Amino acid sequence: MPSFDTVSEANMVEVKNAVDQAGKEITTRFDFKGSDARVEQKERDLTVYADSEFQLNQVLDVLTNKLVKRNVDVRFLDRGKIEKIGGDKVKQVVKIKNGIETEAAKKIVRILKDSKMKVQASIQGDAVRVTGAKRDDLQDAMALLRKEVADLPLEFNNFRD
């Protein structure tokens, strides 16, 4: 019976490359000269430092542009609140989401069940496995999920025949 897994994972190598590129651009840009603006990465957390809230937004804009150019979906980013760290300096922690949360997984299963397609969906940890009798049914299910689930960057992998 053919099946595939629906997952939501960011390519961490591309994220690291985008952070490095953003850091290089920030150090060479004229409007950041003499400022403490930078982006640091620790595993799945990006910490953005800047001298003011306006500058923080500019650094985040540079970072998101680099992520988009490296084909990393910006819907993976979960921005925290802006914290003051002394004087006018501010920082913001941006978490990179990994996996499909339980609520979103239940929503995906519900969408597939409500569509009356001949597929079964089951939650497997942070992924959703979709199984069907025919490969065509699975392709229709993938098209439906791409159309219906707009708030999550979905990927399909682990195809079995």
Curated annotation (Swiss-Prot):
**What does the entry list under GO cellular component?**
cytosol
| Family label | Belongs to the YajQ family.
Name the job this protein performs. Nucleotide-binding protein.
Name of the featured protein: Nucleotide-binding protein HEAR0865
Keywords linked to the UniProt accession: Nucleotide-binding
User: Which NCBIfam families did the record assign?
Assistant: PRK05412.1
Q: Name one GO molecular function term.
A: nucleotide binding
Q: Which InterPro entries match?
A: DUF520, UPF0234_N, YajQ-like_sf
Q: Which PANTHER family match?
A: UPF0234 PROTEIN YAJQ (PTHR30476:SF0)
What is the top-level taxon of the source organism?
Answer: Bacteria
